[in-house]
Regions:
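A short, well-ordered alpha-helix in the C-terminal region of glycosyltransferases
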Residues: 130-144
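C-terminal alpha-helical cap of glycosyltransferases
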Residues: 143-160
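Donor-nucleotide binding loops and adjacent catalytic segments primarily
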Residues: 1-63, 96
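Short alpha-helical segment that forms part of, or immediately flanks, the ligand-binding pocket
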Residues: 57, 75-81, 100
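C-terminal "capping" alpha-helix adjacent to the active site of nucleotide-linked donor transferases
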Residues: 104-105, 113-129
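Short hydrophobic beta-strand element within catalytic cores of glycosyltransferases
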Residues: 66-68, 84-93
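Acidic donor-binding loop of glycosyltransferase active sites
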Residues: 61-71
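Acidic, glycine-centered active-site loop in nucleotide-sugar glycosyltransferases
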Residues: 82, 97-107
Length: 160
């Protein structure tokens, strides 16, 4: 079974009310499975499953947490959005290095396994001050203008 679906099913045991949005990309099978899983969700949990979207930044802007893998692009987007993260299943190598850095800097948490995922989500949702600290830390570390800064440096243009 796909690790994303395992995580979504694990979230069914959350205790706090929540809306969970699963962005399934172009994975039609995952989309179907999540929709099927959502039919059995407890009343306090609302599940949505969406196919590929170009509006990821809008979904991040209205979210309290991001749950997913620590790939480079994902981390760039979550940091630019100051969206606290719960990191799952990093691939050995670059994703493990990314996860280690983000965790050490206090911008994310990582459950020991998928079974503890609902506990971590409930814990963070119960502690808005902790989420605020994580968001602030992300704002301090993020460099959303990094590409412009590199280009300006290469071209010898004074920073904007």
């Amino acid at each position: 079974m796909e690790s994303s679906l395992v995580a979504i099913r694990a979230l069914m045991s959350m205790r706090l009310p929540a809306q969970i949005v699963a962005l399934c990309g172009n994975n039609a099978d995952l989309l179907t499975e999540v929709l099927h899983t959502a039919e059995t969700a407890p009343a306090h949990l609302k599940f949505r499953a969406l196919p590929y979207t170009t509006d990821m930044h809008e979904w991040m802007a209205i979210s309290d947490l991001f749950i997913g893998k620590p790939g480079g692009l994902t981390l760039s987007e979550t940091m630019a959005s100051a969206l606290p993260m719960i990191l799952l299943n990093p691939i050995p190598g670059q994703e493990e290095i990314n996860a280690s850095s983000i965790l050490e800097q206090g911008m994310a948490v990582s459950p020991t396994d998928v079974v503890t995922l609902p506990y971590k989500v409930d814990l963070l949702l119960r502690e808005p001050q902790r989420l605020a600290v994580m968001r602030e830390r992300m704002k301090q570390v993020a460099q959303p203008r990094a590409a412009y800064t590199i280009l300006e440096t290469m071209l010898g243009v004074p920073p904007a």
